[in-house]
From Swiss-Prot:
Protein name: Cyclomaltodextrin glucanotransferase
Residues that bind substrate: 127-128, 167, 220-223, 254, 259-260, 354, 398, 402
A Pfam family reported for this protein in Swiss-Prot or TrEMBL: Alpha-amylase
Cofactor note: Binds 2 calcium ions per subunit.
Catalytic activity: Cyclizes part of a (1->4)-alpha-D-glucan chain by formation of a (1->4)-alpha-D-glucosidic bond
EC numbers for this chain: 2.4.1.19
Amino acid sequence: MKRFMKLTAVWTLWLSLTLGLLSPVHAAPDTSVSNKQNFSTDVIYQIFTDRFSDGNPANNPTGAAFDGSCTNLRLYCGGDWQGIINKINDGYLTGMGITAIWISQPVENIYSVINYSGVHNTAYHGYWARDFKKTNPAYGTMQDFKNLIDTAHAHNIKVIIDFAPNHTSPASSDDPSFAENGRLYDNGNLLGGYTNDTQNLFHHYGGTDFSTIENGIYKNLYDLADLNHNNSSVDVYLKDAIKMWLDLGVDGIRVDAVKHMPFGWQKSFMSTINNYKPVFNFGEWFLGVNEISPEYHQFANESGMSLLDFPFAQKARQVFRDNTDNMYGLKAMLEGSEVDYAQVNDQVTFIDNHDMERFHTSNGDRRKLEQALAFTLTSRGVPAIYYGSEQYMSGGNDPDNRARIPSFSTTTTAYQVIQKLAPLRKSNPAIAYGSTQERWINNDVIIYERKFGNNVAVVAINRNMNTPASITGLVTSLPQGSYNDVLGGILNGNTLTVGAGGAASNFTLAPGGTAVWQYTTDATAPINGNVGPMMAKAGVTITIDGRASARQGTVYFGTTAVTGADIVAWEDTQIQVKILRVPGGIYDIRVANAAGAASNIYDNFEVLTGDQVTVRFVINNATTALGQNVFLTGNVSELGNWDPNNAIGPMYNQVVYQYPTWYYDVSVPAGQTIEFKFLKKQGSTVTWEGGANRTFTTPTSGTATVNVNWQP
């Protein structure tokens, strides 16, 4: 992995459009359901499909795989796509303000019932795939899936699918009769199974002990048959499969287990999506409480996808649920994330999901959940609400955190908190795109401000359930006036009076009180809020959301201006523009309106050299001193443009190959002859291998392997 240097083009081409000479082409508003690249204005509702609503009992599994009472939470309970359709049509989701749903992986899963320690287990969760090009019949038919997409879109709801390309299903290297032997099918045609794997579709290095990143990538996750992404058949199959789901109209993809797949392959996978039909993508890289992982943030910044924001979730749980940290810890997390993430507003925030205990505990204080929901809905990032949170569902780890939703009440306070705050993401860009600043704090109280241009939202939370907080000396960016609590007092909030200079009148925040005050106004200058996708090749159309001007102006990649024909559409809240044929690398994006007023810089956009394929680079006999590692660089931006600081690595040497052989799977331009070399690094000391630059012609599709010896 690497961080690219920013490129500044040496040429500048100014685009000047005379008013009235060219009528502006209009894009959709940034809040539109058709905006598949930007979810900052959305609230996601995560649905475990089997546990939500049974809309069609006829498709329920039979026999030992099904428990209609949902007592055995490891069996199917009956939820399906028709059930989700019904809850869209009856207003349950739209009434809550939900504008995106994230559903279980829709692909066909194994049918076997597996006995683990005397307990029957099924693929109700959707993570035991057998055919990525067919649907799980327990969820519905392909027509049912299309109906779900159409119904959701008709109600202004986007659809995100879970997708797990890391593995197929449980398998045993010693027993081909166990479960379904991890078999993989291509639209019904068998490609192969885990045992007798003559085509090398899977990894066969045993189970991971999670000791290193390399160990987790190339060894099996538990007993799941780990797919070999360096196999051309697997690579092409998975990319064709995701194209099929994109063709069906999905708006986003949540990629499972990104920590456990080669990073280079995932970058080429994202390139395939972005070059085909760009949608919002985010991955799952689990982090525990206070766990620090530089690789986690590096992946978020360089892979082409966002991440589920586990540091956010874990800190919110510590502060609002467990009382193991205070508001200063919450502030530190928010401020640290501004540095750690290149684009913090793209990360998906949450307080619980199917991989952790539910936030709410049995007989716990409901106000804790309500405050955590308010915090998530008004904080930076894209909020995701786990199904049933609005009904105060509780439950420990898997499978207790995946129970059937008990009711669909629209009168719970939690439902109303979501209902009142979710619309702010579309009505106030400060919530969708704004910066975050702490305005008042002590151990139990935080007041923070979100600001985008002159749009402002101020949020106050007192987590102390027994003691009111006397708020004095609060200064905000709100104009002078009186502001009602957006929550309408349901969490004991109050009206805020603001005087000259943003100074708020002293007030008392009730025990357990939460209030939200907000102000919106028109922009006076362009301001960028979101760019998506954040990685693509020249010629791909990207979407810039924020506030600009109704009159078409100029978009810049670095100092290179886009010409008129390459500005596909222009509207006050959204611009669509084609990437110019500039050298591959990292660029700043900015917008200037017709009057010449310039926007803020949106940085870290990667222009790829071209279509991407994955190549495994292997170097033999590369002996190193203690603390020294081997890296790879070359003449394209994907290899660091010969800069040792941007070289790929450190390479691996433990699982697929062992020291002194090193290897790494890298995303490189397809169908091109590239130059490359290996080097050794220890701190700032760099030792290049000798000899001439190496060359390799990459394939136009599939994967390849380069295997060479170290040149002294």
